Amino acid sequence: MNLDDLSHFSQIDTQDYLAEIDGLPDQLQRAWELGQQHALPGWSGFQRVVITGMGGSAIGADLLSAYATPNCPLPVVVHRNYGLPAWARGPETLLITSSHSGNTEETLTALQTGLERGCRILALCTGGKLAAAARQAGFPVWTFDHPGQPRAAVGYSFGLLLAAFSRLGLLPDPGAELANALEAMRQLQGSLRADIPVVRNPAKRLAGQLL
């Protein structure tokens, strides 16, 4: 396969994930900016954080949990299931429900359980039943616009969580570190884009070795 011949890419990459990858730095930056703009109560007094999500919607939660571990004073648990752990209850629990579509069954049951147990809740989604239920209960909903697959929205699922943790005082301000990361990502694109030939593209060379 000639990896410098872009004419056949659309036949293989039918959902245009190449464009999603190219847009990841901009997506992450947009998510951070949205996270600064969305409404958020001046909450405090949390003792634990639970982030619920399934599949692609949970990828950002895993990244946030790994990033937060050295600096967040609270335990952060990523929950991929129906309902909630038994210990997740009361206003000392911050429940963040993440669902790309807003209609994920497991995440909706987690929301309902959190409401019944008196947790404080932040919903992250593009809309759907999750947004409607959280708003009806009086909790903040942070929406974003992404028409693709959940696994291609990792910039949103991570960036919004990062902004929420920062604004709630659960993490030191990551703004400078994020800016450095975005710059590094964009610099890497200069050697990894599909239009960069194999001789100057380490990603294509690795792909060639795997084929």
What are these regions (language model features)?
Residues 26-39, 76-86:
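Helix-loop module immediately N-terminal to the HCX5R catalytic loop
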Residues 26, 30, 105, 159, ...:
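Short, contiguous clusters of charged residues that form electrostatic/catalytic patches at enzyme active sites
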